[in-house]
Amino acid sequence: MKDAAPAPDEITEPSEPRARELLAQYIAAFEIADAAALERVLRHDAALEMVGSRTWFAGRTTCLPYLATYVLGSPGDWRMLAIIANGQPAAAAYRRGADGALRAFGIAVLTVTPTGIARIVVFGDPDLVTTFGLPETLGINCES
């Protein structure tokens, strides 16, 4: 994973407009389940890792099929709120359950550069969402 990381001088700070723009585009892509939009914000060498899992993906052409097949689902399955975690742009993720309620899923922390998202680290722990002062659920009729 270390070889896949961008150089420290390539990382864009979360307060910079480009970092906020990439985070907003990432969130929008997830909320409308648009793999093509997600492809546009990921760097060609993007890495995806899920904390607690031994599996990780390196390269946009490896990350996207996994996300499109197993994660994105249908438009409206996800709702994300922009946050800052560990000093980086991040999203608090909520996933729609069978009853229609959006329940906390976890946190996705992004490493962004001027050329796109270089790394996504997913902490799939619903309890982390509430540590940011956010609710456990967003309700059945929550609009994105």
Q: Language model features by range: what are they?
A:
Residues M1-G73, D77-R79:
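Solvent-exposed, charged amphipathic helical/linker segments at domain boundaries
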Residues L64-S144:
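Low-complexity, glycine/alanine/valine/leucine- and proline-rich hydrophobic stretches
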